[in-house]
């Protein structure tokens, strides 16, 4: 898929007398200097008119929402008629879709200002909500009333913080307040949709800050994390509470979903294994096993693939094991884990040490 082909489609539609625009994420990415993954198009033309314009290359893939897919030499392009959405009684999908006359009406139904921009074939931007300004300010902000946007589709709550993580942006104050006050709406969202957003969020450049600022949001679908927030480890090897250490550990490892999920859940069983010795030092004997058991349940609940779930649980159960730095010790571990997971385990151990205390950075560097 390419901008050149998308532009050609726009001009073809315009040649038939209908307005057409690139919309949503591709416009955002272009303004950020990134190559878009998808090229979505919105047009004043109705689905049947798009079918007439493109003939055998057009396929009705979402007529209920006014969407027709046009197959080109380099991929498939979705073209959706300008529309407005009705009420969202299920908090996920509009009860009814009504075709609109203008691009401004279409953009008004979108979730975030940075996703509510359009670009015509001449390069003119339609930006009624100052999404371009928010890109410059590096801010995630809802279109209109944030509370209303989240009531329409609760997944937008997680999408907002996901964009903050991935783009390295902050969340605008009113939007942030609405996220915290309406986080419970996420309870109605399917686990599969949660997992897609979380995979992206965890691999974002501002993941640590988002995890620390929005633990209450994650706690809706991973309530096991909440007891870790503010839980002092009472140990000379740790300068952070369990949850803060977790956020730093996630940030310290390569942005790959299995590794990031491993770090998010690697100490989730610490609260349940906490003891204090006579000297007042906290210990968490057996926490890798308990954390692994809890992680297995969490990953299954989120409908994670079996192989991914198994890898995450294995890495968690091994993350605190002492592997002798000998040919035999390394060989035994590699035989038990396989080469890929053994290499992952080294990354896990390094990130865990980096997130403990500044004076332990030498251990991470040794690993």
Model-identified regions with their sequence ranges:
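Catalytic cores of the polymerase beta-like nucleotidyltransferase superfamily
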Residues: 1-367
